[in-house]
Amino acid sequence: MKRTYQPSKLVRKRRHGFRARMATAGGRKVIAARRLRGRKRLSA
């Protein structure tokens, strides 16, 4: 059985990147919450 995590920069950006987050209402909430919390990195 292969490992479940097969790193890919492109897939990571598309799924968890800033633009992917901003594309949905829930994603915008995630960014807002991370801003409030003072996260250095908002998204992948």
Curated annotation (Swiss-Prot):
Keyword Ribosomal protein recorded: yes
GO cellular component, one term: ribosome
A Gene Ontology biological process term: translation
PROSITE patterns: RIBOSOMAL_L34
InterPro entries: Ribosomal_bL34 (IPR000271), Ribosomal_bL34_CS (IPR020939)
Pfam families cross-referenced by the UniProt entry: Ribosomal_L34
Ribosomal protein is among the record's keywords: yes
Keywords associated with the record: Ribonucleoprotein, Ribosomal protein
Gene Ontology molecular function: structural constituent of ribosome
HAMAP family recorded: Ribosomal_bL34 (MF_00391)
PANTHER family on file: LARGE RIBOSOMAL SUBUNIT PROTEIN BL34M (PTHR14503:SF4), MITOCHONDRIAL RIBOSOMAL PROTEIN 34 FAMILY MEMBER (PTHR14503)
Family: Belongs to the bacterial ribosomal protein bL34 family.
NCBIfam families: rpmH_bact
Protein name stated in the entry: Large ribosomal subunit protein bL34
Species name: Bartonella bacilliformis (strain ATCC 35685 / KC583 / Herrer 020/F12,63)
